[in-house]
């Protein structure tokens, strides 16, 4: 588990992992019973793979947890974004561009944690940093000259249904609905 930020409690990573474990237990229990083994984990045909607003698919544990979250909350569009990404909708590119209504998270909505592991790659002798993508291209012999330090980071995302996108950016919302219509 991650290192606590304070002496009083668990880290953001620990909280996210606890939430994920609780969700798995809850879903497993909901499927138990007389005919539980016949029930699918997810309602068939209702959801596609979760993505961020830019269209990049989530993977691994994040994808599984976001699918469970969508199923539990009844979200029809599995698209997620951080608070900062929502705020980017409110930035205009030009000074004389007309200000559109502000995009925001709906009052009372809560974010959902996703976790991302990033890697810092440092040359053992020169202490020079290189990008993870560049490190992966090195030969095994060249890789031995570097130390790799993983870092687990937690981000908090909102489903697009938790925002006012439908009301203030109807053209964008229509594109999302078309993408996920069945």
Show which residues each predicted segment covers.
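N-terminal accessory/interface modules of nucleic-acid-binding and processing proteins
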Residues: 1-182
